Every structure is written in structure tokens, then in C-alpha cells.
Amino acid sequence: MLILSIGLIHHTSNKSLYTISPNKGKRYEPFTTTSLGNFQFHVVRFLHRLIYGTQRYQELFPPIQKIKNINNVKQQRIFPVNCAADDLDLGFGESDQIELFNHPSKDTYGQFNLIQLIDIFDPPQVHAPSSADEFFKSNKGSEHIDIFDMITRQPPPFHQHQLNIETPYFEDFATPLVLPPHEVSSDDVESYFSGSVSTVSSIEPLDDEFVPPPQPPRTHTSRKRKHDSISPPASSDSSSSSSYVPQLIPSSSSSVTSNGDSPVSPTTKRKYTKKKQPVFSNVDEPIVITTTTKTNNIDVKKITTTKNGTVENRFDCPSCDASFKVKGYLTRHLKKHSTSKAFECPFFDNHGVHGSKCHPTGGFSRRDTFKVHLRALHFIYPAGVKASQRNSFNGRCAGCFQYFDNNSEWLENHIEAGKCTGTVQYKQNVSNLLLD
């Protein structure tokens, strides 16, 4: 007899074996069997029974034909769906766009007519008795003013009348109440603004919001748009003043007096022209004279230029393109091209047998450049010494490795004295003695 694990197999006969016992207290119940050939292996069913404790194993892996809507609309309809437009006071017209204002042809809001709410208020006790009340009473017969009609009056949607909009949407309440000018007097307006508001009415703080006060008449002063010089003359005859057409009179004067508010006429603007530079026809042309002179027995070209009374000299080098204003500078420069040098490096060897090719020619025409060459290439300094600190450090001679306190002592007492045993001349003399 074999004892098998729970739930991995089940019998293929009519009576199936289940892992869950009818008793809820026993979740797993082992069983014994002797016929293994009548059982089949169902792992998915076992996993669902083990996890969920139910035989409805198709809930996790349902067949495709049982899925009615993949979008799971059933779960979405359980709870109400909130919309951001629910919190706004929006109107919906015939178009598919959300309108900021109600349709102008509809007078209802929320299926209720707003004119029915007028019974809540007490119109007779709005303001204290004043002369402005007579003004409103006089206008009742001419035109019926509906307060709530003015409040709910809104411009048409933008997509319908976007070309006929004269004022912005949100300035509806800012527009003053327009009344016939012949029925309004200045005394009525002043008494309206100076009148005290009654304390009996329950809607006193909101009076100015529902009923905008009449605006006092404005006296617009005409601005002067034209220059004083071109303004028409004053005339008592209305026909002559209306038929007068101002004409621009060109003025030859450059300065025009005008008021601060009136712009300057385009014809009276000052025109600035660039002053032309005077052209002098008697300008001296440069005179160039070329001569030849000698320096160090070398013929050089001298170019003399005379311009506006000044004389300039230029000396050109015959070996290169260099030119100098001073003859002495050219004389010093010509030493570079001379084959015979006044100073020669004692460690230079063109073939590199007894020395090194430390310079293109090994010769120097100037003493200062000769010393700079020796101190830079033929004196050994300690490691890390900068070029500006070479004169204050000790070192050794690169030819014979003799020690010296500084490079000046090495140059004067060792190189110029001819005591170095590492020069090319000393090595050639030693080799000649050995060959003999």
C-alpha cells in the first residue's frame, strides 16, 4: 500500500477524490489507494484548491469564450465615475465642446427659471428714500428693467460669434447701466451716491452686485491732436467751422514750438544730414627714394619716404624679409647670416663623434645669446629647478661632471678659461695623441 501526496492526482472514475474534506476543520486529508492507473495529474486544479480552497479554478485562468468584455466594464459600473466638469458651473450647448457660458437662447438653469426667485427678496425696502428713487420710477414706464435678466445675460459662445465680440467675457458685470442721457440730471446722480442705504433690507451687502449704480456723466476734454500752427481759427459760425479742412503748411524753420500733449507733425521733424568731410585736393603724395648703403661691408637697401613733411627710413635685410627703422638693428641682424661667428659652442659637433649637435650651426654672433645657450644646455641642475632659479642653484658641468656652486662660476672659471676636459677640442687633441 502506497501513501501519496494530497491533491496531485485524482481518480478518473465518476467519484473523484478531492483534497478538501467536507469538514472545514480538516483542510488537507491524505488518502490511500492501490490503483495508480486510474488517476491523472492536474497541477493547475491543485494549485487553485490549495491557494483559494475552492473548485472554481477557472476564475484565475478563464477561457477566452467566457470573457465578454476585456475592458472590464462590469467592474467600472459598480461605483459612480467622477468627472472634473461636475464641480464647475458650465453650460452645454449643441456643440461637442464645453461652453463657459449658457446658450443665449436658453433662459433656464438647471430646469428652473431664474425669474421665479424674485419672490425671495423685498424690492420696496432696498434703499433709503432719496431723489434717485424718482429717477427709477420715471423709467418704469419707458422700459421694463429685469434685474435677474441683467445678471444672467451672457455673451454667446466663442465658437458661434467669435468675430462679433466687442468686449471680453468677464466684463459683463463691470459694464455700467446705460440710460437715456436726457432723463438723468447731475443732482439725481449726486443724491444717489450720497444717499444712505437702509438697514432694513436683508440683501443690502449685495445691492451693488445685482444693481450697478448709474455712472456720473463724464466730461471728456478734447485732446489737441494737431499742432498749434495748423489748427483752424475759431469761428462762431457752425457751418463755417464744420466745412473747414485743415491743410498742412510747410515751414522753413527748423524749430517748432508745440504743446507737451500734441505730437509733432511729420512735416515739421528736423532732418539730420551727415556733414560731408572736406575734400582737400592739395594733399601731399608720399615721395619714395631708394638708395644703397653699406654696413659691415654689406650692401643694404635704404628706402626713404617723405609724406606731409615727415621723413621715414627703412633698411631691408638682403638675406631675408626683415626690415628695420634703425641701421644699427640691421647691423646686429646681419651677424645671424654671417658664416664666421664670433662665439662658438665648445660642445658642438656636427657629426656627433666627440660632442653633440646642440645648435643648428654652433656659432653665435652675440655674447649674451652664447651664454644663454651654455647655461641652458651644458650645465646640469638639480631636478625640479625652474629656468628663473638657475642662477641660484649649484650643479655640474655636462662635459666633465665637475661640481660648481652656480653656473656663473662654472662659465667664467671653467669654460672661458679652457679648463674643461669634456669639450670637443680637448677630445680631438687626446685622440690625435693616441693615434700618433
Swiss-Prot record:
This is Transcriptional regulator STP3. Residues 230-265 have a biased composition (Low complexity). InterPro entries: Transcr_Reg_ZincFinger, Znf_C2H2_sf, Znf_C2H2_type. Transcription factor that activates genes required for degradation of extracellular protein and uptake of peptides such as the secreted aspartyl protease SAP2 or the oligopeptide transporter OPT1. Required for virulence. Synthesized as latent cytoplasmic precursor, which, upon a signal initiated by the plasma membrane SPS amino acid sensor system (including CSY1 and CSH3), becomes proteolytically activated and relocates to the nucleus, where it induces the expression of SPS-sensor-regulated genes. GO terms for molecular function: DNA binding; DNA-binding transcription factor activity; zinc ion binding. Keywords: Cell membrane, DNA-binding, Membrane, Metal-binding, Nucleus, Repeat, Virulence, Zinc, Zinc-finger, Zymogen. A zinc finger (C2H2-type) spans 315-337. Activated by the amino acid-induced proteolytic removal of an N-terminal inhibitory domain. It comes from Candida albicans (strain SC5314 / ATCC MYA-2876). The keyword Repressor does not apply. GO terms for cellular component: cytoplasm; nucleus; plasma membrane. Induction: Expression is down-regulated in presence of extracellular amino acids. One of its GO terms (biological process) is filamentous growth of a population of unicellular organisms.
